[in-house]
């Protein structure tokens, strides 16, 4: 993998709102789907020492509306059945 400059990489804000549905991956495997009004803070919670979730990277899909976020999260969980999501 190569890149010409770090400024060309995707950016995720550390402050402010990045509401949406987020996806945790362990390598190529999708292991968890969640949602929140601030995905950065939610993903940070999954890095706690007592968390059983092991993941190598994450991504998110922006969704501002709370009910739309929750609906999309439920649909995606049912479709993909990530191993760390409870049924």
Protein language model regions, located:
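GIY-YIG nuclease catalytic motif and its immediate N-terminal context
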Residues: 1-41, 45, 63-77
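Charge-biased low-complexity segments
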Residues: 52-55
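Coupling/hinge elements of helicase-like and P-loop NTPase modules
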Residues: 82-87
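Acidic, glycine-enriched active-site microenvironments
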Residues: 58
């Amino acid at each position: 993998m190569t890149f010409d400059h770090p400024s060309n990489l995707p950016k995720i804000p550390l402050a402010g709102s990045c509401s949406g549905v987020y996806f945790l991956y362990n390598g190529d495997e999708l292991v968890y789907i969640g949602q929140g009004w601030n995905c950065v803070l939610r993903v940070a919670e999954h890095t706690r020492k007592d968390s059983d979730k092991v993941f190598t990277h994450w991504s998110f899909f922006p969704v501002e509306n709370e009910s739309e976020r929750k609906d999309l999260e439920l649909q995606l969980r049912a479709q993909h059945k990530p191993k760390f999501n409870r049924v």
